[in-house]
Structures are given as C-alpha cells and as structure tokens.
C-alpha cells in the first residue's frame, strides 16, 4: 500500500477512521523513495520445501514455461512487502517470497523480481513482467485494466510500546504525540484528526513525521511518542523486528484486499496464478511466509479472481 486515500472522516470518538490504504499510481508520492525498512538484516522465507503441483504446472503458458521464470515487477520501497536488501540491489520482502513460492508451485526454475516505478508496473504486464506483486489494492478501476487475484487484506493500525506505558487510547487520540511515516495517508489522516480534535474542544495531536520506520520504532520504544499510526503489516513487522517491544493496540481498521496483477488477455497464466495462490493458502505456506515478516494476520483464505470491491 504505497500510497493511500482518505475518504469521509468519521467522528473523533468513534476511532473507526475512514482511512483506506491502497497502492495508487495517481499520487505524487514516489513509493521507491519512501522506504519503510525497519531492520538492516535481510529476512526471507525458505521456499525450497514447497513442491511443484503438476496439475497447476500444466496450466502455465508455454512461453513462461520455456523461460523458466515468473517475472515480477515491484516498487521496492515498502517494507515488509517489497524493499531492497542492504546491498541496495537485491529485492526482499514477503511479496518477493510469494512470487518465488508461486513459481515453485508452478514448476518453474525461479520467481524473479525487478524494481519498477509503481505507475509503470501494470502497463508492463504481458511484456516485461508476468505478474505485478507490489501491494496493489484491488479496485474496480484496476480490475478494468488487469486481472487481480486476491491474497491479502491490509488496513491501518495503531502501534505503541509494549504495555502501552503512555496509556494511549486509540478511541480518543486527542492530545497525543503520534509518529507517522512521511508521505503516507496516515500522515494526512493524523493531521485531519488533529483538526477535528481542536474543533471538538480537545487537545491537538502533535504529528511527528519520519522518513524511516526505524527512527519511529526507536523513539516510540524510548518513550518520546505516545503511539504510531501505520499499515497493519508495518506494525506487525515492526513488532517482530523490535523483539516484541512494540505492539498493536486496537483493531485494524479500513482494511482492503490486495491482489496479484496479471495481463487481462492472459487467461491461462491468470488461472495458473490463481490456483497456485489457492494452493499456498490451503497448505499454510502463505501464512508461513507472511509470519516471517510479522504479517500473517493479513492472509486471505480464498484466492478470488477480480472480486467485487467497493
């Protein structure tokens, strides 16, 4: 969810905030320039134990099978989904591992991911890339352009230092000091929420933007902030990387499904990807991959093709 859009705001007291997180190429935010990496060491899931499923492998188009690789385009600036390793050249993240796992199920030699600026991924499907696995929120507009196979459900969440030492109340954040990542909708939302607090006669929210989640985590644990607001997967990943020193408080809200994008005219590859993803769901591999990044709660159980969305 590289960029996000705010819809009609609800009241401050409800805290059921109307924030939708979605990857949206119409924004001016450059997803590749706004990393959410929270650890310097590489994290990955070993896909070597995942078997090839012959019935699914038989569905793979000839050109993909002959090439032997499933080519994925991803904008690698969004941990834990897709980001660059410390070498600045190797894509890592759960979306990268998922692409490798799909290739394994489909009987291919490898799942390869290359960085691409977010708005360029969908136009390159069917030529440069076979799939786009890059935190694409499923929208009706995207489903008109490409086929979308659902696999995740991601929303926004509040995070606090474990034990909530600042007694942060997600139902009434007025007067709190909140850390957000620069350029996200959470930054926009926190500012809007602060205005609503003031209008309601309550204390303003002090919004502290940071380029890196590492900085947010350090200061949150150190007691400088009351809470942070980010994507639910980012909160889960930060909790894992901090050794449990950060935890989510309250429920994930305004969740939206994410999907794998495939060229609209490639029905054969679409079917292969959909069935391979369903296999990963049914066998627990998808959950295991996501758990490596603290994001297992985001896993869906049904790989729907072009599901109905609002």
Placement of each model-derived feature along the sequence:
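Acidic, polar ligand-binding/catalytic clefts
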Residues: 111-172
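C-terminal motif of bacterial Sec signal peptides marking the signal peptidase cleavage site
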Residues: 18-21
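A ligand-binding cleft/hinge motif common to bilobed small-molecule-binding domains
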Residues: 136-143, 191-192, 221-255
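Periplasmic-binding protein-like
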Residues: 152-160, 236, 240-278, 296-310
